[in-house]
Amino acid sequence: AKAIQNEKKRKAFYDTFAAVANKYSGLEYDNKSVYIAVIAQSPAELIREGELLDHCVGRMGYDQKFAREESLIFFIRTKEPPDVPFVTVEYSPSRRKILQCYAYHDSTPDDGVLQFVNLTWLPYANKKLRKIQRSAA
């Protein structure tokens, strides 16, 4: 009985995570840039990202914070190939700012990536966030 209860909780959590990812999918960015920003779709994606980039996004409660909408995780990718982990961003929707931005092994991304994140994606995401919040009000 406990296994069934745990499975129901896990499924409910995954459903909540997916609903949050869907709600904020408008903050994804794929315009005229070498880079794209995509939102994490599942806790499993966070684990994969953390393992491949050798940092802590797959552990330490980031999935819980995401499900509670405290912070959102976006993956910064190069357009080609878009599925290879590159840089991970933790974004606060309430404060509209980037909390963390790390490449492999918690290293600081290069200037081109930082410029994309701070000067291109962040203003874009904040503008889109206002639209999401207005439509929810």
Where are these regions (language model features)?
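Catalytic-core elements of nucleic-acid end-processing and repair enzymes
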Residues: 1-137
